[in-house]
Amino acid sequence: MSHIQIPPGLTELLQGYTVEVLRQQPPDLVEFAVEYFTRLREARAPASVLPAATPRQSLGHPPPEPGPDRVADAKGDSESEEDEDLEVPVPSRFNRRVSVCAETYNPDEEEEDTDPRVIHPKTDEQRCRLQEACKDILLFKNLDQEQLSQVLDAMFERIVKADEHVIDQGDDGDNFYVIERGTYDILVTKDNQTRSVGQYDNRGSFGELALMYNTPRAATIVATSEGSLWGLDRVTFRRIIVKNNAKKRKMFESFIESVPLLKSLEVSERMKIVDVIGEKIYKDGERIITQGEKADSFYIIESGEVSILIRSRTKSNKDGGNQEVEIARCHKGQYFGELALVTNKPRAASAYAVGDVKCLVMDVQAFERLLGPCMDIMKRNISHYEEQLVKMFGSSVDLGNLGQ
């Protein structure tokens, strides 16, 4: 085996995925892998110019579309080996639907949303079941409350019987499906031979990649028991989810470029940071970071206002402790919490939400693992770092002592 060479970029690719798994602890590793590598692929080229990926592509290129639209989403140990053998699917032996996704879609071109809303009425009981089925769907995680409500309104229930085909290999994508209950086989036809490459068991989702990239269904999904699915039509899926993902990427990239400490990053480094940034919402008065605690993240304010306070050594509160004194206010586009990452000391101040606040959060462990030691990157702008120290705390202040 000594003649086998590791392809360039493979180690970094797998390290990045491994770090995200350890950080987020997803319940479904395969579903998480599909989401992670889909985002990675989207970041490399606009959706409108992405080629139809073939599973023969190397890891040095945009990853393939795995699965029934996501064969890799299935549970079981066999799919990873079998997926490597998959080639562009041959047309299904079943009748093809009329083409519904031949046109190119570019979310950047649709600035105004004038399409009528799709609403499928539901009983309270149906709504509750739908919310429960969707709570762990990764594609819905970044939607705000209004967007999620629109998605839930547009979803429709589909009851399936055993042996019913939900989607057929080679067909055009028309709906995205979330599984509420039931078991389903994932079948792939190659060289006129059909084989099972995985199963779904009362959870999961499938069908999104054909809608996102205008590619035919890569597998057939057959119900092996009676079950229930929730479908989302292609138009709503692309209007809300695809467009939202594109906007989120642009917004995150824009925020990163606006942070002085990160302006010197290469484009490739910024793209990696986009992948490790999360989003958190804080209510009025909620404490975001605490003075004296170990630093593990830094924050960029997406919306709202944040108050920065330190404990006074000369003023006491009513409980006899050191009173907190406000030293700064941060607003949209500004950031806080990065100094502790550079000094590797406890938090020098506390931060509180003033009104409702939405922050982009970068985890220092993922940051360091993906891009190298945090200090190496921050040193590129060390003069700005020193300027921030003087501005916020005074040149003679020891940050380590402030955290005690």
From Swiss-Prot:
Keyword S-adenosyl-L-methionine carried by entry: no
Expressed in which tissues: Four types of regulatory chains are found: I-alpha, I-beta, II-alpha, and II-beta. Their expression varies among tissues and is in some cases constitutive and in others inducible.
Matching CDD domains: CAP_ED, DD_RIIalpha_PKA
Post-translational note: Phosphorylated by the activated catalytic chain.
Task of the protein: Regulatory subunit of the cAMP-dependent protein kinases involved in cAMP signaling in cells. Type II regulatory chains mediate membrane association by binding to anchoring proteins, including the MAP2 kinase.
Localization (cell): Cytoplasm; Cell membrane
PROSITE patterns: CNMP_BINDING_1, CNMP_BINDING_2, CNMP_BINDING_3
Post-translational modification Phosphoserine, affected residues: 48, 58, 78, 80, 99, 350, 395
Residue ranges, compositional bias (Basic and acidic residues): 67-78
Protein name as it appears in the record: cAMP-dependent protein kinase type II-alpha regulatory subunit
Assembly and oligomerization: The inactive form of the enzyme is composed of two regulatory chains and two catalytic chains. Activation by cAMP produces two active catalytic monomers and a regulatory dimer that binds four cAMP molecules. Interacts with AKAP4 and CBFA2T3. Interacts with the phosphorylated form of PJA2. Interacts with MYRIP. This interaction may link PKA to components of the exocytosis machinery, thus facilitating exocytosis, including insulin release. Forms a complex composed of PRKAR2A, GSK3B and GSKIP through GSKIP interaction; facilitates PKA-induced phosphorylation and regulates GSK3B activity.
Broad class of where this protein is predominantly found: cytoplasm
InterPro entries listed in its UniProt record: cAMP-dep_PK_reg_su-like (IPR050503), cAMP_dep_PK_reg_su (IPR012198), cAMP_dep_PK_reg_su_I/II_a/b (IPR003117), cNMP-bd_CS (IPR018488), cNMP-bd_dom (IPR000595), cNMP-bd_dom_sf (IPR018490), RmlC-like_jellyroll (IPR014710)
Phosphoprotein listed as a keyword: yes
Annotated positions of the N-acetylserine modification: 2
Family, as annotated: Belongs to the cAMP-dependent kinase regulatory chain family.
Biological processes, Gene Ontology terms: adenylate cyclase-activating G protein-coupled receptor signaling pathway; intracellular signal transduction; negative regulation of cAMP/PKA signal transduction
GO molecular function: cAMP binding; cAMP-dependent protein kinase inhibitor activity; cAMP-dependent protein kinase regulator activity; protein domain specific binding; protein kinase A catalytic subunit binding; ubiquitin protein ligase binding
